[in-house]
Amino acid sequence: MSGHALAARTLLAAADELVGGPPVEASAAALAGDAAGAWRTAAVELARALVRAVAESHGVAAVLFAATAAAAAAVDRGDPP
């Protein structure tokens, strides 16, 4: 397993630990050695875990505030919607 795939699996495990869920297996991309796909999968899973954790501890309003701030930052950077 490549270093990138291992890092992606570690991020997935950290995301699960953060929200106390069951372990998530590495994505098919990670197992196939697709480092870019593994990183995207890990990033999405970590973002989902963070959203769940914030919603559980601070409520939905905090999630909406964070999403609005992230969207505003993307617009400032010129990222496409």
UniProtKB/Swiss-Prot annotation:
GO biological process: positive regulation of growth
UniProtKB keywords: Toxin-antitoxin system
Function: Antitoxin component of a type II toxin-antitoxin (TA) system. Upon expression in M.smegmatis neutralizes the effect of cognate toxin Rv2653c.
Name of the protein in its database record: Antitoxin Rv2654c
